[in-house]
Structures are given as structure tokens and as C-alpha cells.
């Protein structure tokens, strides 16, 4: 807790810790630089437990994926979550935790329930984001905290603006959508033969179908067109942060950035996800 004096008035300010999970794309190294904490998400590879960016690197993960390993995700254990909060509360007065969307994982709802045991000192924000939009929420929270806003004020802003974001996604192969049960083997086979590429959208809680086109070039154009429409119509007159996320290689996101230069867009970041 610290005090600031303005116009003779003493303002008491709580020390606020910002925390998120590794679904934000923020690495442990970057978290250290930002002065925040990132909860590593657990996953199983051939029934062996790993923690993202702790016991397995991204490069190793994609190598195992290419080897057709059996991979499944899980949520952090309540004990791990509470232990990290308790550690932070030894140094800070309050914690703002920004996990992935409750519509995509039960880990958010679990965290909300666990926070009730901390007498209002832990604030869990279900602002229904993941990846680059979740990352942006974290960056916004850091900026608001550094401006002197209270934890309640920061949470109010994040919740009020939670739906003011979109993610557009495409994939170069249908293999993993089939393997994860999101499409049937028959649909995957037909899509592969016809070179169909799905464009998906995360707008709020869940992952939904947005479009279906032929070829990865058309898929990327569809995403850029959708973003341009959002900027001109949905977010007209507002400052918009853009980010390109990628897997395995940065080449794809770099090409998307080059394709958007004619639109005079300025990209804020391009983390892997």
C-alpha cells in the first residue's frame, strides 16, 4: 500500500498485481519484463503432464504435434492457482487475474469460485478473451494500474469493454480439427480434396464458424476484409489495436501484415499462440 498527496489530500493506493495464464501468449520471460505473473497451462502429451513454457518449449510442442502425439489440454489445479495468489498477496494488496474465456475453458469459473476465499483481495476478470485479445486486456490492465486506477476501476473497464474485440482464425490443414473432433473425418476428407479452408471467429465466449473459402490465400483475404469492416463500421472513430498470432512460424503473420499495408494499419504485436 502506498500514499500519494495531491492538493493537500492523501490518497491511499493499494499495490496491485496483474496475473494471467499462458493462453494469452505471454511467455514467462516477457512476464518478468512486464512485472506480471503468468500461470502456465497444463497439457498432456501421450499421458505425460507438461506445463506450457515451463517444462516444454513451443518448438518441442510443435515437434511432438508433427509426430502425431496424443495431446490434450487441462485446467490448472486449484492448489496451483491459490498458491500463486497467496505468494503474490505477500507482496501486493490485491491481485487482478485475467484468465482465458469461460466459454472456452472451465478454468475461469474455477478461479472465480476460488477467489471467494480471499476476502475480496483477488479479482478474477471473465472478459471472454483468449490469445492476442486476452493479451491486450493484460496490457490495458497494466497501463490502468500504472495510472493509479484502483483494482475495482480496472475490473470495471475490462468487463465493460470485454466484447470490443474479435479474433479471426484460419488453418492450413484440417488434420487437427478432425483429430480434436471439431469436424467429422468425412468433412475433413472432402475439405482437403476441395482445398477448403475454414475461417473461424472468436467474438465473446466461443469459437464459431465465420466463412469457408478455397485456398489459404482466400482465407487470409477473408480475415483481412473482416478486420477492415470491423475497423470502419464496428469500431469507427476508435483507436484499434491489431495483432497477428501464428503457430510454428512467423512467416504467415508477416505476410498478413504486408498484405494490410495498403490499408495503413499499424500492428502492435505478433506473439505466437
Regions found by a protein language model. Give the residues of each.
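Enriched - but not universal
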Residues: 4-6, 88, 268
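Short, Lys/Arg-enriched N-terminal segments with co-localized hydrophobic residues
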Residues: 1-12
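N-terminal glycine-rich anion-binding loop in soluble enzyme alpha/beta folds
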Residues: 17-75
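Mixed-charge interfacial surface used for oligomerization/domain docking
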Residues: 10, 23-37, 42, 94, ...
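Class I S-adenosyl-L-methionine
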Residues: 49-117, 122
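A generic local structural motif
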Residues: 4-6, 23-25, 82-83
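Long, low-complexity, intrinsically disordered polar/charged segments
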Residues: 12-18, 89-91
Amino acid at each position: 500500500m502506498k500514499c500519494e498527496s495531491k492538493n493537500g489530500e492523501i490518497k491511499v493506493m493499494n499495490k496491485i498485481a496483474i496475473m494471467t495464464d499462458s493462453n494469452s501468449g505471454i511467455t514467462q520471460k516477457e512476464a518478468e519484463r512486464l512485472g506480471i505473473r503468468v500461470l502456465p497451462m497444463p497439457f498432456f502429451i501421450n499421458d505425460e503432464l507438461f506445463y506450457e513454457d515451463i517444462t516444454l518449449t513451443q518448438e518441442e510442442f510443435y515437434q511432438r504435434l508433427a509426430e502425431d502425439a496424443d495431446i490434450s489440454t487441462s485446467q490448472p489445479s486449484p492448489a496451483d492457482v491459490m498458491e500463486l495468489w497467496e505468494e503474490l498477496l505477500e507482496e501486493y494488496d490485491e491481485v487482478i487475474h485475467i484468465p482465458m474465456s469461460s466459454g472456452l475453458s472451465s478454468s475461469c469459473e474455477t478461479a472465480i469460485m476460488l477467489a471467494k476465499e480471499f476476502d475480496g483481495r483477488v479479482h478474477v476478470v471473465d472478459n471472454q478473451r483468449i490469445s492476442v485479445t486476452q493479451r491486450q486486456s493484460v496490457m490495458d490492465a497494466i497501463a490502468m494500474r500504472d495510472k493509479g486506477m484502483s483494482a475495482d476501476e480496472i475490473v470495471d473497464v475490462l468487463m465493460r469493454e470485454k466484447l470490443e474485440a474479435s479474433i479471426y482464425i484460419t488453418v492450413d490443414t484440417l488434420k487437427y480439427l478432425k483429430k480434436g473432433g471439431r469436424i467429422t473425418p468425412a468433412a475433413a476428407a472432402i475439405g482437403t480434396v476441395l482445398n477448403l479452408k475454414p475461417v473461424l471467429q472468436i467474438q465473446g465466449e466461443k469459437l464459431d464458424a465465420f466463412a469457408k473459402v478455397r485456398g489459404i490465400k482466400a482465407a487470409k483475404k477473408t480475415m483481412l476484409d473482416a478486420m477492415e469492416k470491423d475497423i470502419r463500421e464496428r469500431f469507427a472513430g476508435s483507436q484499434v489495436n491489431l495483432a497477428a498470432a501464428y503457430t510454428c512460424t512467423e512467416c504467415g503473420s508477416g505476410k498478413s501484415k504486408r498484405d494490410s499495408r495498403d490499408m495503413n494499419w499499424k500492428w502492435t504485436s505478433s506473439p505466437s499462440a
